[in-house]
Amino acid sequence: MRDRSNRVKGDEPSTVLFDTWLTARAAIALLDSALAGTGLDAEDFAVYSVLRQAGEISPGELARWMSAPATTVSSHVKRLVARGHVRQVPHPEDRRSYRITLTDAGQHAHTTAGRLFLPALATVEAALPRPSSDVQQALQDLRAAIGAAAQRA
């Protein structure tokens, strides 16, 4: 049976969740460094990427994607609107709600940051011991497992 203690010394991983946390922190630090000077941090870049792909999305959909509380997303959206990178548009079916979309300035900021993101991505992918598609599938499986565990908790 594998030792599941939280090791501080040695090369052996401690637990899947702890290693996931460490990996997330390392990825955020790498992206924050790569994106320095663009005005976007790793979280901004991820949100802009989702908005660019979705076109328009409700704050609730963004909250589910981010696995974040609605209040966190609301604060984030307000900051991006104030920056002029995101605009709120009325929801076509629900007048009480709105959708968010990138402005032209937001798309430009995302494109500029993307030019710095791609070399960081290429460096990480080149260092992987297996194909990036396999690693990405494992990460998607892990996220699904964490989501399922959160539902049961």
Residue ranges of model-derived segments:
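N-terminal leader segment of winged-helix/HTH proteins
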Residues: 1-38, 99-102
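Charged, amphipathic alpha-helical coiled-coil/dimerization segments
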Residues: 78-137
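Generic leucine side-chain signal with a strong bias for well-ordered alpha-helical environments
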Residues: 35, 51, 62, 80, ...
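C-terminal regulatory/oligomerization modules of transcriptional regulators
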Residues: 1-9, 115, 130-153
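N-terminal helix-turn-helix DNA-binding core of bacterial DNA-binding proteins
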Residues: 25, 29-72
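Amphipathic, non-transmembrane alpha-helical scaffold segments
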Residues: 20-24, 28, 66, 110, ...
